[in-house]
Amino acid sequence: LAIEPVAEHRMFFFVRQGHPLVAAREHSLETILVFPLVSPRLPQRMAVHLGKDAAHARVDRETGDLTPSLMVDSFAVARNAVMAGDAVGLAPLVALEQDVRTREISLLPFTAPWLQLSYGLFYTRKRPLSRVAQLFMTQLRQVEVVLQAREQRALARLDGKKRTRRSAKRKARTAAEPAARVAKSTTAPARRARTRQ
């Protein structure tokens, strides 16, 4: 067989707005996977990390693949399951982009180098590809170029939002510090005056 890698996409855990994990302070795998996982069957390279923490999921002994709590092959079905309850979904950012913008779903701040969707094409080396198959491969790669660019823009927006939130928190802390100093300095003379009386 000849195998041609096509693309890689970062995967994100996502939940509905108002989900208990949105307000959680910790987002470890252990914390996230307390909730049912909704996704397609996951390959062994992900299963070795998710298998021990994913409640009600099981690892296939022969393939090493992970069958999640709720296995679905359609993103629309996975999204609906996540929106209807407390399940956690797993998908690439390009699939979630619109829902993130409208704030219907929330991405959980968990990243790992192994949390990637990788796919490719395979065919028999001995048999030459038909012109239709070659055309399909060319068009698929062109679509992927567009998707990769969209994904990079969406990631940049996410990083920008995180930075804005961090700087806003810093500014709020910095603004609160002088007020706290002034309050301390005004209470100190008052205490001294009381002790003199």
Predicted features along the sequence, with ranges:
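Alpha-helical segments flanking ligand/cofactor-binding loops in enzyme cores
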Residues: 4, 30, 79-80, 134
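Hydrophobic hinge/microswitch elements
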Residues: 43-108
